[in-house]
């Protein structure tokens, strides 16, 4: 295939601005699917994506388009996620393309994730075509949005395309702009094979599948290839593309995006961003690869059935193959047994992984409180990174504790600016900058990550009636007053409920968890004491009263000492029961107790 007729492009936008709907219309216009096969969000293959109306995994599809100049062009479309938790998926997709369609909702304008994604595209040297979507709505204001694009982002918006992805207006113009304004891929057909590994996933029938972009040379069926980071050698079994159906082809050459299978058994050989080359004729230098991504939110996941531990381990391995940003290690809990300490890019990422484990692998799970990575410096100068409360150590040995901070970009209509700033201040935030574009405020704040990951996104959306948008990036570590909060039930610490909290909020958090547990733990035959402690100091307590059997019911008058004797006997029995019995704590109590409302 002549690379002159190839166009590789990504669709980038803020969440809910219509990326997946635009992808549907492009597929429909290019006859990628028959009318009877078309459905909304056709590239969103997971049920969870359809139900939530979001894209989680970047998807690729090759389309054939006959342009006005009479030539047939091959368009490789990458539909990318819009939520901040999946920004790593966006970065990978952009590395495989030369251009981007920047989709902006013409009723909403530029939002925070629009900025983040377009800057990623600029860093990738992309040609960018602004596309203003939803122009058929009465509240659409294309001129205002063009001004915003030029003022806030700093790119020319004079030739922005006006479309309605839902009704199909302007789709032909988008396709013509792709072939006329976006560059063809560079690279040399005669050079040794050089391909970048963009994504991997597990297929029940094919095993490990690799999505790649050929930069130089050609890859053919039967060729022996090398993973340059590990020097692992494999023979290519199958080569294919998505149209969006899987279609087997003989080869992929310069500029093409497709998938291969090669009977790969070792997950460690498939590193996202690795360079693939031919064993007999290796390329000189590997590609730069992708920026290593590190999880920022951690929580423990336990199977509710002890026998499901191995099933959970296998499920996590398969999900990790499909999502390199997700990590896990074995953990043992006194309360919940064997499980895994898992790392995520944010709370939505955590929810999606847990939901996929439960749906796709039919597992019943309990997740503990999410937390972030703290740096603990001991008195002898040793630095430890801790994300698990169990590893906090003795307070007497700690010289200082640092917590991660972020730089948040918040875009909000000016009428909601006051409540948003108030929320940021309540979350221990520090204002960095405030600017305006029309009646939209662009707010920059530094905030502790621990205050952001749990419910900050939902709270911002709620107080701004859905109009505010948020993006953030890591901004280093700062000294902080941090304490480990321990929850005790009948004087026994419950490790699954331990959490690391800022000292200014430790009493409030302790009281709230105790109150929640009081509502969630059923009454027993003996009194249950629920306590929150920092070190040896009890900071909150709630008591669950026992059931009381009326042991004196059979008495009718007579000596009062008989009554006292029966009550004393009941008291001794309950004391013995309390000493030998375990408190029955329902599994859902753990996660419910930690869903604290500010």
Curated annotation (Swiss-Prot):
Name by which UniProt lists this protein: Elongation factor 4
Compartments reported by the entry: Cell inner membrane
Keywords from the UniProt entry: Cell inner membrane, Cell membrane, GTP-binding, Hydrolase, Membrane, Nucleotide-binding, Protein biosynthesis
Residues engaged in binding GTP: 16-21, 133-136
One of the Pfam families matching this protein, by short name: EFG_III
SMART domains, per the entry: EFG_C
Signal peptide extent: none
Origin organism lineage: Bacteria, Pseudomonadati, Pseudomonadota, Alphaproteobacteria, Rickettsiales
E.C. no: 3.6.5.n1
